[in-house]
Structures are given as structure tokens and as C-alpha cells.
Amino acid sequence: MPDDALYVYGIVKLGFDLDWREAGIEGKNVYTISECGFSALVHDCEEKPYMSEDPNKIKELIIAHNKILDRAINHFDGVIPLHFNTIIKKGGNSSQYNLKKWLNNNKERLEKTWDKIKGRGEYGIRIYYDKEKLIEEVSNSEEIKDIETNREGKGAGLSYLLQSKAKTKINEIGWDKVNGFKKKFYDDIKKVTANLKITPSRIFIDEEKDLLVNLSVLADNQQINKIKGFLEQKIGNGFSFQLAGPFAPYSFVENETA
Amino acid sequence: MLLTLLSKMKQHNIGIVELIDRTLNKGVILNADLVITVADVPLLAANLKLALASVETMLKYGVMGDWLVPVSLNKEENKAIETVEIKN
């Protein structure tokens, strides 16, 4: 079967065709197809998606896809990443014609997205809090101490009710504090970069720690250093964090250039 | 020594899992008739997400299976998913 389809990794603002000579998925030669000042990073492929039941093979595909995006960030000062396995078919024309048509039709939205992501990378920030420390602090608060004091000398039934009340109150105050922490971190980081999203976390790695919030931020070097500095100041006060990246700005291009 | 190694592997794995999560779930989607998406991608996504789920399970139970070990041996790939951890 001839390679008459195009696998598209991402879009850069280049404006002319370039035989980039980077090795993409399965070692395929990656080059650019340009239209209206934008260039798609592509390789020739068959009209079928890349798939495998072998996890190692899948890993290779994902790493290869991202390697090209990482190189593009360095070479072109940014990249608009496309969804993994975006393959343009030939149809009644050529796949190249179809891609150029799409670039042309989406020029304005590509410009807008490029302005946002140029010179910036995406980072994942996981902020954890010390749950035990928080519960201890809340348990020692005046409000809870008053309930405990009231329990003294009371009969078993009333004492039990007050104990339940204290537990419920600890829970309520605890959650209020957690939500307050979350909002404060979000607001403080937002002061550094407006491009910030709370990401639902599906992955829990450090089970000894409780995840306060999982964020994706789009930041340049200066901004991410500022964010790191800010987070480092919080270390030792019952918080810790993990920062991963830079990645291609996956979380900041969705539904904007489609 | 072992704890340091495990800590480093965990840092690395967080970078890997974050990267996979983004690659499979995010990015620009071309809404064009001539893009292979309609019939094939849901199947592909299900397949890949199954692999991702197995990684999460391995990480959850602290098992560093074959799926991840080769990645940690490749300098080029390590560079691409550099992860920084700062803790107490």
C-alpha cells in the first residue's frame, strides 16, 4: 500500500517548506508542508492509524510523537501539538492538498493560538498537603476544644453526641481549609501566568501524600522559575509539590484551532 | 541509596505518565472529513488507555515493570521528559 496519507505531529510558524530530516514515528522522515505562514510537521504514511497491543510498541509511538514536538519547540520556538494519530487521507485530491486547505481555513485561529504558546512550555504541577498535620491543627482549634470541654462530666449519650459533633466539625473545618489552600495556590500562580488550568488527576503516585490540586500551566522560563520559587517557599509548611515538564502545550490548544 | 533510586524512578514515572496522559487525551483535533478518526480512533484510544491503566496500576503498587524500565535507560527520551521534584 503506498504512503499516500500524512501523519501530522503539530503546526509551527515557519512559512516555507523544509526537509527537516528528523526521524519520527518508526524512523519516518519528518518534513514540513506550508500554507499561509504556517507549516505542518508531517511524515508520509498509510491510511491507517498506528496501533498495537504491545505496550512497549505503544510506548515507542508516544515517545516518538513527542520527540518531534520537543525538537520543534527548540527549533521553531513553539509548536501547536495535534492529537496523537492524526492522519490525513487522500480522498478525491491529495493528502497534501487537504492539509493545506485545512491550514488555510484555520489561519486566524492558528495565529491566535501561536501568539499564546510561542516561547512557552506546558508544565504539570502537583501540590500535596499534609493531611495528618491539618487534622491535628484543626483538632486543637478553639472551636473543637470548646466542644471537647463541654463533653466533660456529661452522660454517655450526650458525650457520644458531642464527640460526633466534634468529628463532623473537624471534617467541615478541614475541607474548608483545603478548599482555601487550593484557591490560594491557584490565585497566586495565576498572578504569574494567566494560562492555568486545574487538571482532574487520574494518577496517584505518592500515596503517603494527599493531593491538594493538580495544575497545568503554560509558562516561559522566567515564569516557571518564579512559580518554582513561590512553591519552594511553601515547602516545610505542610506542603510539597512535584513539577513535570516542559511538554508541548497540549492543554492550551484544545478546541481553539479545530 | 535504594530510596534515592526509587525516588528518582518515581519522579521519572510522574513525567512519563503526565506525558502519556496529555498525548492521548489532549491536543488539537482536526474536524475534517479526510482525517482518520471516526471509525478507528475510539478503538485505538481504548487500546492505549488500557495500557495507560496498567501503568497506573503498576505505579500504584510500586511495580516497575518492563513497560517503564526501557524508557529510563534511554538518555534521549529522559531528556524529553525531564522532571523536577522539590520536596522538604
Regions found by a protein language model. Give the residues of each.
Chain A
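An interfacial alpha-helical scaffold signature
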Residues: 1-258
